Amino acid sequence: MSWLFGLNKGQQEPPGVPGFPEPPSPPGGSGDGGDKNKPKDKWSNFDPTGLERAAKAARELDQSRHAKEAINLAKVQEETLQMEQQAKIKEYEAAVEQLKNEQIRVQAEERRKTLNEETKQHQARAQYQDKLARQRYEDQLRQQQLQNEENLRRQEDSVQKQEAMRRATVEHEMELRHKNEMLRIEAEARAQAKVERENADIIREQIRLKAAEHRQTVLESIKTAGTVFGEGFRTFISDWDKVTATVAGLTLLAVGVYTAKNATGVAGRYIEARLGKPSLVRDTSRITVAEAVKHPIKITKRLYSKIQDALEGVILSPRLEERVRDIAIATRNTKANKGLYRNILMYGPPGTGKTLFAKKLAMHSGMDYAIMTGGDVAPMGREGVTAMHKVFDWAGTSKRGLLLFVDEADAFLRKRSTEKISEDLRATLNAFLYRTGEQSNKFMLVLASNQPEQFDWAINDRIDEIVHFDLPGLEERERLVRLYFDKYVLQPASEGKQRLKVAQFDYGKKCSELSKLTEGMSGREISKLGVAWQAAAYASEDGILTEAMIDARVADAIRQHQQKMAWLKAEGKEGAKEIGKNPLQPLLEGTQV
């Protein structure tokens, strides 16, 4: 019933309980009316209105039919309040218990901190004591070292003093000995001079007698030799048979010396032309005596080897492959029928397979090949003409026929009218033109150049076939990537002898992707890319070539290729912007494929 007395005003009144009207205010209830000067008692401000309302409400509640429910509701509210108070008491007790636990935890934390601080103090004290002990030990060592150094210094001073005393003693002894020696020499010289002065007449007489005897001996020797040679020459002249035999012998000796000298030169030149290798030739398949002695097994295999396909290992575009195959067949048939060989000019960017095809062409035709570079001609100077004639003389002695491949031919076969070339190089060029003026059945001339427009017109007149080697296309690049990936990666990994393994990924798909990324690269650059993959595998810790390593090497090669192209463009070379452009299109229009 707390709500009757104004308690729990915030709570809602129970349903079913009628509201009680407020009683009217009694007259004069206000404390303001009346005389202000009258003394006030303690009940002067008491308002009985609340008691009246409570009494009235109690009477109405007793008379109401909901009285019992109201009483029960009041009891329930009182029990609820009691339970809330008990809950608050429990919460207070829990808070007190938590506070006690917190105090215990704080005390334990303080105790732990105290123990840690004591431990730190003990450690600091121990470290300080150890530091003091180390300092004392270091001071002792320092003092001991200083004492040892002082003792050593004293010993050195003592040794130096003893050495100085010994040196002074030796010097004094040597000085005394020198003085005694000088006195002795002086005494001997004086005695010798005295003796010579006393015996001067005797000495002069002895010298005079010796000179007279020597002069008499020389004169007698001259007379004896003249007599002997005179008698011999007189005897030789008087006998004409001896004179004739002597003249004939001297003549035969001179003829023999001259013949041996010239025969040796002729034999040397013959051996050099037949068995040796000219200085301008860098590489050749012809068998030399030195090579046969060094590598007999290799030479035997070469002699009994079968004829190879001209395009084995050479990857070209279908049109170019068809053309060079026709050239290979024609060359082979020319050799078989002992006809005249045709001269070929191969031009195009570097690394497109010109040198490789020349070697394969020689092997396919059963011919020997010899490779020379144009850059080796200019440094020879005056010897260039002789060296050039030696090359062609040597080429003419080949029984199987020789394919003479001149790489970088534009280095010395330049235009004589416009290019500034030396007289020696001009003479060498004239010798080359003289030896290639007519077609031969002994050798076949193959020129390779990156700038064929710089050739002398006489060189172009000696060319029978012009072949353009362009950069590989997408299909050719994919074949090249697969070829070198198999050669430098898969084959070494499958052999098991080398430290190289390949991770698991789709090799064919990767080769197709790389062929698209390597646009603009030559066959040589792609082959170097295969070598780079192999080197990357060897350089790794486990020797496994992963796909990421392949991509990294390809990206590096692409950057290097772009840098090279930028350098070519900066140098102003015409072939850098359009590297696949055909500079000899007017000449090729009239050439049958």
From Swiss-Prot:
Essential for mitochondrial network organization, mitochondrial metabolism and cell growth at organism and cellular level. May play an important role in mitochondrial protein synthesis. May also participate in mitochondrial DNA replication. May bind to mitochondrial DNA D-loops and contribute to nucleoid stability. Required for enhanced channeling of cholesterol for hormone-dependent steroidogenesis. Involved in mitochondrial-mediated antiviral innate immunity. It catalyses: ATP + H2O = ADP + phosphate + H(+). The chain crosses the membrane at residues 243-260. Can form homooligomers. Homodimer formation at the N-terminus may be regulated by ATP and is required for the interaction with the inner surface of the mitochondrial outer membrane and correct mitochondrial homeostasis. It is a single-pass membrane protein. SUPFAM superfamilies: P-loop containing nucleoside triphosphate hydrolases (SSF52540). Pfam families: AAA (PF00004), ATAD3_N (PF12037). GO terms for molecular function: ATP binding; ATP hydrolysis activity; protein serine/threonine kinase inhibitor activity; zinc ion binding. Residues 1-64 are annotated as: Disordered. Keywords: ATP-binding, Coiled coil, Hydrolase, Membrane, Mitochondrion, Mitochondrion inner membrane, Mitochondrion nucleoid, Nucleotide-binding, Transmembrane, Transmembrane helix. Residues 52-215 form a coiled coil. The transmembrane domain and a C-terminal adjacent region contain all information necessary for mitochondrial targeting. Gene3D superfamilies: P-loop containing nucleotide triphosphate hydrolases (3.40.50.300). This is ATPase family AAA domain-containing protein 3-A. Residues 33-44, 53-64 have a biased composition (Basic and acidic residues). GO terms for cellular component: mitochondrial inner membrane; mitochondrial nucleoid; mitochondrion. The keyword Membrane applies. Residues 1-242 are mitochondrial intermembrane. It comes from Xenopus laevis. It is found in: Mitochondrion inner membrane; Mitochondrion matrix, Mitochondrion nucleoid.
